[in-house]
Structures are given as structure tokens and as C-alpha cells.
């Protein structure tokens, strides 16, 4: 309750934290942001570190001397309330599942001078449609949608038991980092932070530094930060940036030195093309390599990224039988750990054009190849049951088409997005229409509707019906997950 009281007490206007641009993810008009002032040279006759020394025999005013900024602390946050209803096949209107995930972020941003910055962001999560343990009170429900758009198969299956592993509400730490420079040459960011790699819109195989994959159909990135120490070395003369990173909690918290991960990334501007290459080693696991580029090609912007995995990040599963009443779940599948290498690659093109005076639109297409994926949907129940299911990264081939446009009235700050994503391996699809309207300066209203279609049992048109089974001698009641026909969602977001 102390954390809750503290967060609710935080108010005021401030700058947003270092997050991936939600406009770049969702097609809204890009809002210009003021750049932080560049560090200036030390005053003539003074050393850069003179301000850190105390002058004997007299007091000094740190604010007048410029050592501490007058507005050193900023406070702000985000209130984000969503409401999602999913129409399921064969369900009456009164039994239609709903979810109302609430996210409240509060941050403190300290900038005592232009070379030091500290940032902390706490997050409260709550869903009034779930009980205190995060479970629906009736039926299968939609589960926890705090980090999900509910576009694919569920991440867990109803098993007739109550889980007490999640609290509702729940407070989590999103970001907590300190940033400073070493002689204005090397820039250090240490702590729990957001760092996203990759240039593709929907699928980012090179996004190595997060323990979660981004849901591309969410309005903006809701993932929590990860703890790391990042050293950035800009080489402006060569148009190059070099990043060296130590990972502390990816893929798991490092309780020993041997569990730490190390990553290196180099970015370079070559003509009009932006190129990047990275390498990653984590806790004795096989190394991972990646590369990406983006460049103009005539009227189009093209981009691509690829990752090479030295080994499979987890077991590979295959079915060994069909479920029969009373059978043990473990007898229905087998697991193996194949050796690499494995490749994931995505790429696409987009075309920007004016669709009316002062109104822009973007059309694009993207493809994703996933050698770590599966060729059909029959294995999905096993992946969900074992906790190995990864939405948008389970199939072998994916594709997407989209069109996003600014609304006709430039003073109403509206945007529309039409998108279709398909798991080409299992033949399931989802088509979606999104609307966004920013009003009263700080409020954003969101609405969307989507339709699931294609092969039943596929990722985007999932269904599952099983008889009563057992798991290690414990009974598992029959599971019935009907097909979701369509979803309707509303959202209200306040940024302050």
C-alpha cells in the first residue's frame, strides 16, 4: 500500500522516458520532441570537475553556480485503461468474455545537470474483471492482457484450478537507471531500462535485449525494462556508434558472474543507408548474431533484419499421439534439443504518400521467416501447456499488409490503421482496423475491431477441445476453448 500511495501522489507535467516511439509502431503522426541541450564547454579558467570540490571557508549556492539545475526533478506518468470484448463461437452475448486491463505508470526524472540523469518508473497493473489472483470469475475469460493484444492463441489454458502466482492489483518496477558520461566521450546508462534493436514494424528477430517479444498490435510497447549496463561510444567522424552492454537479468536473473550476458552492437551510416550488426552471449548459451539495415529505394523505404542463433533457445516438441480420455499429458508429446544454427529474418517495404492536402498515409508489406517455428497448429496446445508458446513467433512463415493514414482534419489529431497479419504456415489470419484520436492535449482515445479467420486451430483462429486427461496422476478436466470470431476494444490514455 505504501507503493500505491506514493504512486498516486505523483502528479505534474514532465517528459516521457526513453521508450520506443509509439508513433513508429502504430502509424500515428510523429510528434516533434525537443532535444536535450548538448553539454557545453567548461567556462574559461575552470576545470570541468571544479564544481564537485568544496571551497574552504565559504558557502556556495549550487543553483547560482549552475552545478544543480533549478528544475532538476520532473514528475509525470501515464494512465492507460483498456476494455476488450471477444465474441466466441457458440457463446451467448451474456457469456462473452471481457477484460479491462488498467496500467498506471508514475516516474521521477532527475537531471541535476546536463551530464547526469536518474530515472525511476513504477507501474501498477489492475484488471477489475479478474479476482485477486488474476483468474476470471466465470468461464475461461481472456486471461491477463496487460502485455497482450489477445490476437493469437492464449498463453495459458483453463485447467479448472486456481493459480495464486499473480496478484491483482500488482506493482512492478518498469525502469530505474542512472545515466552519465565519462569525459563526454563514453555515455553510460546503468540499471533497468528499455533498449530495442531491430528495424522491422511487426517482427524483430534481432530484439535480443528484452526477455519478452513485442506484441505488434498493441498501440505502444508495454514491455517492462531489463537490467543492464550500457556503454555508448559515438564516433561522429566515422558516422558510427558502438554499444557495449552487460546483461544482468536476461534470460534469467544472474545470481553468479557466469550467468551474466554480454552484447556488442555497431551502427554505421553508409550513404543513405543505416546499417547495424550485433553479437550476444548469455550465461554459457550458444552465441547469437544479428544484422539490420534500412535505406530509401526510389519512392520506397526498404528494411530488413536477420538473427543467427547458435542453438535453440528452448526444447523442440513433436506430437506422439492423440489425446484420449484418462491419458497422461506427458505421453502425448516428446521433446528434443536440436543443435543450431537457426535463422530468423524479417524484411519489408513501405511507401509514404499524401492522400489529401497536408495529410499523409503509409502503405507497407512485411515478411518473416522463422526457422525455429512450427509448420502447423496441431503442436500449439503442447507449447501452451509447457509454457513455450510465443505469440507471433510460433509459426515458420508470417506475412503482413498495412495502411495507416492521418485523419482528414489535421486539427483533430486522428489516425487510422488497417492491417492484416497471417501465419502462412498454419493458414490463420487476423484483420484489424484501429482508430486513434488525441484531444485536450494530453488524452488519447483508441478503438479497434478485428476478425479472426482461416484454418481453425491456427494461431490467429485458435480453438481447442480435449477430453479429461491426467498430468502426473493429477486429473485435468476437459478443456474447451471456442474459436474467437472477432474482438472489439476501446482505450483511453492520459500522458502527463
Regions found by a protein language model. Give the residues of each.
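Transmembrane beta-strands of outer-membrane beta-barrel pores
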Residues: 81-87, 114, 124-128, 192-196, ...
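Outer-membrane beta-barrel "beta-signal"
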Residues: 231, 401, 466-496
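Residues on the lipid-exposed face of transmembrane beta-strands in outer-membrane beta-barrel proteins
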Residues: 81, 104-110, 175-180, 229-233, ...
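Residues that define the transmembrane beta-barrel architecture of outer-membrane proteins
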Residues: 98-102, 169-174, 223-227, 258-262, ...
Amino acid at each position: 500500500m505504501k507503493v500505491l500511495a506514493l504512486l498516486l501522489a505523483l502528479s505534474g507535467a514532465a517528459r516521457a522516458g526513453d521508450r520506443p516511439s509509439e508513433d513508429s509502431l502504430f502509424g500515428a503522426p510523429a510528434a516533434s520532441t525537443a532535444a536535450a541541450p548538448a553539454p557545453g564547454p567548461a567556462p574559461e579558467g575552470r576545470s570541468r570537475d571544479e564544481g564537485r570540490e568544496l571551497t574552504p571557508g565559504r558557502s556556495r549556492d549550487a543553483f547560482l553556480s549552475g552545478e544543480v539545475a533549478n528544475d532538476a526533478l520532473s514528475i509525470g506518468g501515464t494512465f492507460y485503461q483498456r476494455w476488450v470484448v471477444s465474441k466466441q463461437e457458440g457463446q451467448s452475448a451474456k457469456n462473452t468474455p471481457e477484460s479491462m486491463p488498467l496500467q498506471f505508470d508514475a516516474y521521477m526524472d532527475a537531471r541535476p545537470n546536463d551530464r547526469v540523469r536518474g530515472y525511476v518508473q513504477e507501474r501498477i497493473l489492475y484488471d477489475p474483471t479478474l479476482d485477486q489472483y488474476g483468474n476470471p470469475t466465470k468461464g475461461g475469460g481472456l486471461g491477463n492482457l496487460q502485455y497482450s493484444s489477445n490476437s493469437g492463441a492464449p498463453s495459458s489454458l483453463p485447467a479448472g484450478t486456481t493459480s495464486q502466482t499473480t496478484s491483482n492489483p500488482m506493482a512492478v518496477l518498469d525502469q530505474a537507471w542512472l545515466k552519465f558520461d565519462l569525459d563526454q566521450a563514453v555515455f553510460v546508462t546503468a540499471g533497468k531500462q528499455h533498449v530495442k534493436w531491430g528495424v522491422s514494424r511487426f517482427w524483430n528477430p534481432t530484439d535480443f535485449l528484452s526477455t519478452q517479444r513485442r506484441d505488434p498490435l498493441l498501440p505502444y510497447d508495454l514491455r517492462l525494462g531489463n537490467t543492464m549496463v550500457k556503454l555508448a561510444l559515438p564516433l561522429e567522424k566515422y558516422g558510427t556508434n558502438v554499444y557495449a552492454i552487460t546483461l544482468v537479468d536476461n534470460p534469467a536473473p544472474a545470481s553468479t558472474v557466469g550467468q551474466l550476458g554480454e552484447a556488442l552492437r555497431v551502427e554505421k551510416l553508409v550513404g543513405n543507408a543505416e546499417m547495424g550488426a550485433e553479437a550476444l552471449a548469455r550465461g554459457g548459451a550458444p552465441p547469437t548474431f544479428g544484422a539490420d539495415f534500412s535505406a530509401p529505394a526510389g519512392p520506397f523505404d526498404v528494411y530488413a533484419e536477420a538473427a543467427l542463433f547458435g542453438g535453440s533457445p528452448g526444447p523442440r516438441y513433436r506430437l506422439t499421439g492423440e489425446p484420449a480420455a484418462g491419458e497422461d499429458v506427458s505421453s502425448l508429446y516428446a521433446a528434443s534439443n536440436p543443435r543450431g544454427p537457426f535463422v530468423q529474418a524479417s524484411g519489408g517495404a513501405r511507401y509514404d504518400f499524401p492522400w489529401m492536402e497536408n495529410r499523409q498515409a503509409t502503405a507497407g508489406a512485411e515478411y518473416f521467416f522463422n526457422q525455429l517455428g512450427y509448420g502447423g497448429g496441431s503442436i500449439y496446445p503442447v507449447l501452451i501447456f509447457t509454457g513455450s508458446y510465443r505469440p507471433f513467433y510460433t509459426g515458420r512463415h508470417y506475412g503482413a499488409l498495412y495502411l495507416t493514414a492521418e485523419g482528414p482534419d489535421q486539427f483533430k489529431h486522428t489516425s487510422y490503421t488497417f492491417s492484416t497479419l497471417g501465419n502462412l504456415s498454419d493458414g490463420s489470419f487476423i484483420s484489424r482496423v484501429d482508430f486513434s484520436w488525441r484531444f485536450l492535449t494530453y488524452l488519447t482515445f483508441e478503438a479497434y475491431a478485428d476478425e479472426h479467420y482461416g484454418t481453425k486451430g491456427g494461431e490467429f483462429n485458435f480453438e481447442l477441445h480435449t477430453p479429461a486427461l491426467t498430468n502426473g496422476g493429477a486429473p485435468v478436466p476437459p478443456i474447451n476453448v471456442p474459436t474467437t470470431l472477432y474482438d472489439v476494444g476501446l482505450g483511453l490514455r492520459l500522458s502527463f
